[in-house]
Each structure stands twice: as C-alpha cells, then as structure tokens.
C-alpha cells in the first residue's frame, strides 16, 4: 500500500533497492477533497452532538459520568475521543504539507522550504492538541494577568505577536499561491482563529472562575467546533491544491509481480 498521485507515477520515494518490483491492481482509495471534507464534517458533527448530550446530562440531570462517556466525548478534555480526532486531523495536515513540500523539493522550486516549515508547525500543533501543553506552559502567565486584571487579554498578549511573526515570514509565499488557495487558506485561518483566540478570549473574560458552569461548556464547545471546522477547511484547501497542481492523492493497493 503506497501513496501516489492521480498521475499514476508509481515510484519508490525512499529509493530502497531491495523492494520487489510492483504492478498496479485496480484497487485504490482516492482522496477526493469533497469526500474527505464530508466525512470529517460528519465526524465533527457526531463529536459535537455527543459532547452536547454529555453536558446536558451533567448540568441538567446531575449525571456527570455515565460510565465515563461524558468525559470520553468531552471536547475540552485531554485523552478523549475529540482530542484524539483533533490531533489526527492536524497531523493529517502535517502529512499533506510534507507531501507537497517533497514534490516541490523534487521539482527544485524555492517555496518548498515554506511548505516544510508549515509541516513542522502543524506537527507541533498536533502534539499540543492531544497533550494540551500550551495551557500548562501559559498557566503562570494567565495567573499573573488575572492578578493584575488582564486575564481577558491573555491569549492576545501571547498569540497575536507569534501570529504576526509567522504572517510576516510567510507573506510573500502566500502571495505566490493560486488565488483559490489563498482564499481557502484565509477562510480556514479566520474560522480557526475565531475559536482559538476570539471565543477563547470571551470565555476567559466571563468564565475563568466558573469552569464547571454551563456557560463555560457553551464557550469551549463553540471554540473547539470553530477550530475543528477551520482544520477541515485547511485540509480541503490542501487537497484542492494538490489536485490542481500536483495530482490527486490516492492510496493504491499493489500486487507483487509474479
């Protein structure tokens, strides 16, 4: 089983000489941008509904466990089904970015470094999605800002400068991308940041001391939903870019030549 493009260029990207010669069978799974996005949207819908039902059970009926199901599908918990999905989705972005970078590198195009850079960024984001490292690192910052009355500005003070630096580094690269790709990238980024910074900012302002309140559940559900939708849009944008400028991605099942 190998990853190839729709141009049907079957090769050994690792250049390992002892691999047997392979012939192509008709079995393949094509990563259509529309179909991938549709599947991911159904998954996100299921996770959001499961989380919402769990919070209704907790806040309105006093059942906060339900055999561990409330925690298992909580969008705001580590080591839960939603955190596993979110980490996988971001990791998939990193994989797609790596494949795009590798192709551009093979073509000796200068922008491959930017694609590799994004792949590394999304790999780190995938690790953070599952482990929630950023909250542990920045908790002292949040505590200090709370003490001086600036808790509602915690995310702005930490993340906006970082985003500005990344935007400054990538501005020329983004300008060279096809216009449809730019639009999709911007839309995905806006939706993601509305959740990661916007809703998070509002949630910190109103619910910092009320982590068990219903309002906090509403805020983090909206936050995580925006982040997941933003990632789906980004995956769709990457697959559309690959489809138009590299080739449609597919998993092809190959038979050994007899």
Predicted features, each with a name:
Residues 95-99, 160-179:
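Alpha-helical transmembrane segments in multipass membrane proteins, preferentially the mid-helix core
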Residues 102-113, 172-183:
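Membrane-interface helix-boundary motifs at transmembrane edges
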Residues 28-43:
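N-terminal membrane topogenic signal
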Residues 79-90, 149-165, 222-228:
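Membrane-interface loop-to-helix entry segments
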Residues 45-64:
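Alpha-helical transmembrane segments of multi-pass membrane proteins
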Residues 43, 114-122, 179-204:
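Alpha-helical transmembrane segments of multi-pass integral membrane proteins
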Residues 126-167:
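Membrane-proximal helix-loop-helix units in multi-pass membrane proteins
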């Amino acid at each position: 089983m190998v990853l190839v493009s729709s141009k049907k260029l079957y090769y050994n990207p690792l250049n390992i000489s002892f691999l047997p010669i392979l012939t192509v069978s008709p079995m393949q799974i094509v990563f259509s941008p529309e179909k991938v996005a549709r599947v991911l949207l159904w998954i996100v819908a299921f996770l959001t509904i499961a989380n919402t039902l769990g919070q209704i059970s907790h806040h309105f009926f006093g059942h906060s466990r339900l055999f561990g199901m409330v925690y298992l599908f909580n969008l705001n918990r580590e080591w839960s089904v939603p955190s596993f999905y979110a980490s996988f989705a971001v990791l998939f972005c990193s994989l797609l970015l790596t494949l795009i970078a590798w192709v551009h590198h093979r073509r000796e195009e200068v922008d491959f470094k930017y694609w590799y850079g994004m792949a590394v960024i999304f790999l780190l984001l995938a690790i953070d999605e599952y482990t929630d490292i950023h909250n542990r690192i920045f908790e002292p910052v949040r505590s200090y800002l709370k003490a001086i009355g600036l808790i509602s500005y915690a995310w702005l003070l930490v993340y906006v400068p970082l985003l500005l630096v990344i935007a400054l580094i990538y501005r020329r690269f983004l300008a060279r991308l096809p216009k449809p790709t730019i639009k999709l990238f911007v839309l995905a980024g806006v939706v993601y940041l509305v959740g990661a910074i916007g809703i998070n900012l509002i949630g910190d302002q109103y619910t910092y001391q009320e982590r068990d309140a219903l309002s906090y559940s509403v805020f983090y559900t909206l936050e995580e939903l925006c982040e997941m939708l933003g990632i789906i849009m980004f995956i769709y944008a990457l697959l559309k870019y690959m489809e138009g400028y590299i080739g449609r991605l597919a998993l092809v099942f190959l038979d050994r030549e007899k």
